[in-house]
C-alpha cells in the first residue's frame, strides 16, 4: 500500500469549548488519521492566549509529525514573547514568531527534542551503542589473549601451525583462479559473496557507514538504499552491502603479490612503451589530453551540481528532524473585533461572511509566480509536477532546512520560506464563523463547499432539542472528505484536521415547545377574561 493503510483509521480526536466571558467564542474540532500510515497533524485551540486574545491554529506535518507537534507545544509562548506582541503589533509578532521558531529548529538542543518526539535515536544514543559494541570486542580480545597466555607452546603450535598449513594452499589457489569466495580483483571489486564477509559487515555494523546506510562503493550504496527496511532508525544496510575497501586475509594477499611480482613489472614496462608509441603515431599531445580531462571534469562537476539541486530530503542517508521534516502553519488571533491570520503553506483559514466564503489565507505553491521567482533566486528548480527540486510540493513551511542552505540569503528568501502571509479582518455582524483546516479537507472540497456544508448543519438540533455540537459537524465533514479507497490520485487519503470557531455565542438550550406556549397564552387570556367579567358584574350590582 506504500504510504497508505489497507483500511483507513477513522478514529477521531474531537472536542468542544468556549472562551471566557470577555471572548465567548464557541469552537469545536476533530482530527482523523485516515488512510495515512501515521498522523502528522497538530492543532491549537486556546480561547485565552491572554485576557484579550484567542488563538486557533492547524499544523500539517510532512516527513514526520515532530515539527508539527513542536509548533503546537511552543509557538503560542513564542508569539507572546515577541516584543511586537507586547506592543500590540500582532501582525509583526506573528511574522517574527514564525521565523523565530523556524530558526530554533536548527539548534542542537531542539534537534534532540525533535528526535525524541519522532522516536528516533539521537547521536548520543548511537555513540553509546557504538562504544558498547567496541567494549564487547575488546573484552573478547582480552579473553582470547588470556587463554593463549595460559597455553603451552605445543598447544599454540597445534592451533596456529595447522591453520597456516591448511590455509596456504587454499589461498594460493584462490589467488590464482579468482573463483574462490572472498576473492578480490585489482580494482577492489568484490567477488562472489562469502558468508565470512557478511558476518564481518554485520559485526562492523555500528560504524558511520552502516548508520548512514551507505558504503564507499556507489553500487553498495544503491543496494543499501533499496534493501534497507523503511523506518529503520539507524538506516543500517543489509549484509549484501559491503565496502570496496574491505581487506582480504593477509596470507592470501601476500601470496598473490609474491606470485605476480615479476609479471607486474613486465606489464608496466610494456605499458610505458605502448603509450610512447601511440603518442608518436597519432600526434596526440599530453596538452590535448589534459584539455579533454578538464572538459570531462567540468561536465562531471555540472552533473554533480544538477544532481545536488535535484536531491530530496533523506537521499543523503541519515534523516535529521527539522531538516528532512517540516510543517505548514495557519494561525488565527482574535482580539476584540480584529481577526489576524498568519499562514505558511497550504493549510487554510476561511470565514463565512453572510454565507459566502472569505479566504483569510493564501495557499503557497511552488508554481505560483512570486514563489517560483524566490525559489529560482535561491538556486532551486520546480519540476513539472510542482515540486521544489523534485521533492516538497510546498513553497513555505516551518522546518525543511534541507532547502534552506543558501548562506548568501536571509531566511525569508530561501527556497522554502517560513515567512507567513498576514491578513486582517474587522469582524461585523455578517461574519458568522470561521474554519481552519489542513489540505486534507481543501483538496477535496472548495472553501465555499465547506462553508455551505457547515451552514446547513450549524442550526440543526439533536433529539433533545439542543444545537448540535460543533465537533459533531466537523466529524461529519471528515467522513464526507474521506476517500472510499486509495485507487485514485490520493484525494481524500490524507490526514484531516479541522476547527470551527463561531464569532457569536450559541444558544444551545432547547427552545420552549410551541404547545406549551399556546397553553400558557390560553391560561393568561382566560384569566384576563374572568377578571374583566367579574368587574362587569360588580358594576351591575352597584347599579
Swiss-Prot record:
The gene is PPM1G. Mn(2+) 1 binds at residues 60-61. Residues 123-139, 259-310 have a biased composition (Acidic residues). This is Protein phosphatase 1G. Residues 26-503 form the PPM-type phosphatase domain. The modification Omega-N-methylarginine is found at residue 22. It comes from the Eukaryota. Belongs to the PP2C family.
Amino acid at each position: 500500500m506504500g504510504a497508505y493503510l489497507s483500511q483507513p483509521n477513522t478514529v477521531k480526536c474531537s472536542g468542544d469549548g468556549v472562551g471566557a466571558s470577555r471572548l465567548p467564542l464557541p469552537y469545536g474540532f476533530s482530527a482523523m488519521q485516515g488512510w495515512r500510515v501515521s498522523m502528522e497533524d497538530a492543532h491549537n485551540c486556546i480561547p485565552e492566549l491572554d485576557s484579550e486574545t484567542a488563538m486557533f491554529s492547524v499544523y500539517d506535518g510532512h516527513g514526520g509529525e515532530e515539527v508539527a507537534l513542536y509548533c503546537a507545544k511552543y509557538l503560542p509562548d513564542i508569539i507572546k514573547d515577541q516584543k511586537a506582541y507586547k506592543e500590540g503589533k500582532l501582525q509583526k509578532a506573528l511574522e517574527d514568531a514564525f521565523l523565530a521558531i523556524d530558526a530554533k529548529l536548527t539548534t542542537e538542543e531542539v534537534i534532540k527534542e525533535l528526535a525524541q518526539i519522532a522516536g528516533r535515536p539521537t547521536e548520543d544514543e548511537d555513540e553509546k551503542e557504538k562504544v558498547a559494541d567496541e567494549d564487547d570486542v575488546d573484552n573478547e580480545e582480552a579473553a582470547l589473549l588470556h587463554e593463549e597466555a595460559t597455553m603451552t607452546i605445543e598447544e599454540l603450535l597445534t592451533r596456529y601451525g595447522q591453520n597456516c598449513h591448511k590455509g596456504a594452499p587454499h589461498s594460493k589457489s584462490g589467488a590464482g583462479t579468482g573463483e574462490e569466495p572472498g576473492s578480490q580483483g585489482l580494482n577492489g571489486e568484490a567477488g562472489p559473496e562469502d558468508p565470512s564477509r557478511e558476518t564481518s559487515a554485520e559485526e562492523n555494523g555500528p560504524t558511520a557507514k552502516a548508520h548512514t546506510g551507505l558504503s564507499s562503493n556507489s553500487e553498495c550504496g544503491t543496494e543499501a538504499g533499496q534493501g534497507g527496511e523503511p523506518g529503520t532508525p539507524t538506516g543500517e544496510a543489509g549484509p549484501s552491502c559491503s565496502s570496496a575497501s574491505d581487506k582480504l586475509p593477509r596470507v592470501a594477499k601476500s601470496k598473490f603479490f609474491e606470485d605476480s611480482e615479476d609479471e607486474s613489472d613486465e606489464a608496466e614496462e610494456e605499458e610505458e612503451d605502448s603509450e610512447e608509441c601511440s603518442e608518436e603515431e597519432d600526434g596526440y599531445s599530453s596538452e590535448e589530453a589534459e584539455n579533454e580531462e578538464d572538459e570531462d571534469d567540468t561536465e562531471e562537476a555540472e552533473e554533480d551540481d544538477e544532481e545536488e539541486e535535484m536531491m530530496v530530503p533523506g537521499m543523503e542517508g541519515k534523516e535529521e528532524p527539522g531538516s528532512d521534516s517540516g510543517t505548514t502553519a495557519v494561525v488565527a488571533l482574535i482580539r476584540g473585533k480584529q481577526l489576524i491570520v498568519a499562514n505558511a503553506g497550504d493549510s487554510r483559514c476561511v470565514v463565512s461572511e453572510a454565507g459566502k466564503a472569505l479566504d483569510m489565507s493564501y495557499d503557497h505553491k511552488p508554481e505560483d509566480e512570486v514563489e517560483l521567482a524566490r525559489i529560482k533566486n535561491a538556486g532551486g528548480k520546480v519540476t513539472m509536477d510542482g515540486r521544489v527540486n523534485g521533492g516538497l510540493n510546498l513553497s513555505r513551511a516551518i522546518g525543511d532546512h534541507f532547502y534552506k542552505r543558501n548562506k548568501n540569503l536571509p531566511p525569508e528568501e530561501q527556497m522554502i520560506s517560513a515567512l507567513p502571509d498576514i491578513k486582517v479582518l474587522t469582524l461585523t455582524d455578517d461574519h458568522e464563523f470561521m474554519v481552519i483546516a489542513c489540505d486534507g479537507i481543501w483538496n477535496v472540497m472548495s472553501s465555499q463547499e465547506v462553508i455551505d456544508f457547515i451552514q446547513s448543519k450549524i442550526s440543526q438540533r439533536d433529539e433533545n432539542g439542543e444545537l448540535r455540537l460543533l465537533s459533531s459537524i466537523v466529524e461529519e465533514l471528515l467522513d464526507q472528505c474521506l476517500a472510499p479507497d486509495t485507487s485514485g490520485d490520493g484525494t481524500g487519503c490524507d490526514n484531516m484536521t479541522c476547527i470551527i470557531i463561531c464569532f457569536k455565542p450559541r444558544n444551545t438550550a432547547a427552545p420552549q415547545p410551541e404547545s406549551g406556549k399556546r397553553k400558557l397564552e390560553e391560561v393568561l387570556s382566560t384569566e384576563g377574561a374572568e377578571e374583566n367579567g367579574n368587574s362587569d358584574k360588580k358594576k351591575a350590582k352597584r347599579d
